[in-house]
Amino acid sequence: MIIAVDFDGTIVEHKYPAIGKEIPFAFETLRKLQTEHHKLILWSVREGKLLDEAVTFCRERGLEFYAVNRDYPEEEKNLNNHFSRKLKADIFIDDRNLGGLPDWGMIYEMVSKRLSYEDLMRKYESEYEPEKP
């Protein structure tokens, strides 16, 4: 799958333009998804120097993205007159999701088992349903 991942508020705490503290298990989960052959795209509002800082921050923690703010590494805005900021990703992981950002353990479970929120809620409801007398 192609997975677009936001930076501020998703991988690190939201301190833009500074880089916030790492969100627990974000890097571990993303590296694990890469080992399972998912393509990760960093999808951020950051540009220029601020974007370079975010990419370096991730690289220093062992996370190298397939592409950054584009669909594929070779894509060049100046050579593409129909360039769109909208990615062709299968999944978007972003703190601005409806319902907010789940914890990274839940994100991994949803991606690896291809579960929707509805599937996940149904699963947890059945697991925690009290026994009837």
Give the residues covered by each predicted segment:
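C-terminal cap/substrate-recognition subdomain and adjoining C-terminal extension
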Residues: L51-P133
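Alpha-helical substrate-recognition element adjacent to the catalytic core
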Residues: M1-P73
